[in-house]
């Protein structure tokens, strides 16, 4: 029973972590106050504001307080769904205005075509929202890559460090765990995926990166399936 699908992490695996931490996160933090002020009555944004109030256990939090909470979550790199949804909406404006392009490692761009030729399905799994993932891959230096993916998963699928998230992916794409390969740079994610029965490979793009007992690669060019 061979590999039929690849699930890739984004930050640190397909995308330079510096792009996320030094461009996307600061951009969302800077734009957040004005974005919330202007869009607070948009249904999706309004729902996110309510979710923030619920998670923070502050049901009566003002818009200013919600903004303060979200800015703190950005600093902490919290994987909270309402934050990720709002960040995705803010980044959509940034991409549309041409303020940045989505960084994708060239070795992954090249590998995508090979996976399609092999008949493999390709999915991404990120703590960033599905919308943010689609924006990242559609605004890459190599153009729109979204048609090379079969789907995307985010925090609504589960916490990437918990086994259940990968069980949910298995159920969604209707393959057996051993037919799926998960590639990530984060050991805790690989451990959770392995516990769910998936094949795993660690992407090590930085020599200072923490490694464990999993097979490692430094480029998708090294990945043989």
From Swiss-Prot:
<keyword id="KW-0460">Magnesium</keyword>
<keyword id="KW-0479">Metal-binding</keyword>
<dbReference type="GO" id="GO:0043874">
    <property type="term" value="F:acireductone synthase activity"/>
</dbReference>
<comment type="similarity">
    <text>Belongs to the HAD-like hydrolase superfamily. MasA/MtnC family.</text>
</comment>
<comment type="function">
    <text>Bifunctional enzyme that catalyzes the enolization of 2,3-diketo-5-methylthiopentyl-1-phosphate (DK-MTP-1-P) into the intermediate 2-hydroxy-3-keto-5-methylthiopentenyl-1-phosphate (HK-MTPenyl-1-P), which is then dephosphorylated to form the acireductone 1,2-dihydroxy-3-keto-5-methylthiopentene (DHK-MTPene).</text>
</comment>
<comment type="subunit">
    <text>Monomer.</text>
</comment>
<dbReference type="GO" id="GO:0043715">
    <property type="term" value="F:2,3-diketo-5-methylthiopentyl-1-phosphate enolase activity"/>
</dbReference>
<dbReference type="InterPro" id="IPR036412">
    <property type="entry name" value="HAD-like_sf"/>
</dbReference>
<comment type="pathway">
    <text>Amino-acid biosynthesis; L-methionine biosynthesis via salvage pathway; L-methionine from S-methyl-5-thio-alpha-D-ribose 1-phosphate: step 4/6.</text>
</comment>
<dbReference type="InterPro" id="IPR023214">
    <property type="entry name" value="HAD_sf"/>
</dbReference>
<dbReference type="GO" id="GO:0000287">
    <property type="term" value="F:magnesium ion binding"/>
</dbReference>
<dbReference type="InterPro" id="IPR006439">
    <property type="entry name" value="HAD-SF_hydro_IA"/>
</dbReference>
<dbReference type="GO" id="GO:0019509">
    <property type="term" value="P:L-methionine salvage from methylthioadenosine"/>
</dbReference>
<keyword id="KW-0378">Hydrolase</keyword>
<comment type="pathway">
    <text>Amino-acid biosynthesis; L-methionine biosynthesis via salvage pathway; L-methionine from S-methyl-5-thio-alpha-D-ribose 1-phosphate: step 3/6.</text>
</comment>
<dbReference type="GO" id="GO:0043716">
    <property type="term" value="F:2-hydroxy-3-keto-5-methylthiopentenyl-1-phosphate phosphatase activity"/>
</dbReference>
<dbReference type="InterPro" id="IPR023943">
    <property type="entry name" value="Enolase-ppase_E1"/>
</dbReference>
<protein>
    <recommendedName>
        <fullName>Enolase-phosphatase E1</fullName>
        <ecNumber>3.1.3.77</ecNumber>
    </recommendedName>
</protein>
<keyword id="KW-0486">Methionine biosynthesis</keyword>
<dbReference type="Pfam" id="PF00702">
    <property type="entry name" value="Hydrolase"/>
</dbReference>
<keyword id="KW-0028">Amino-acid biosynthesis</keyword>
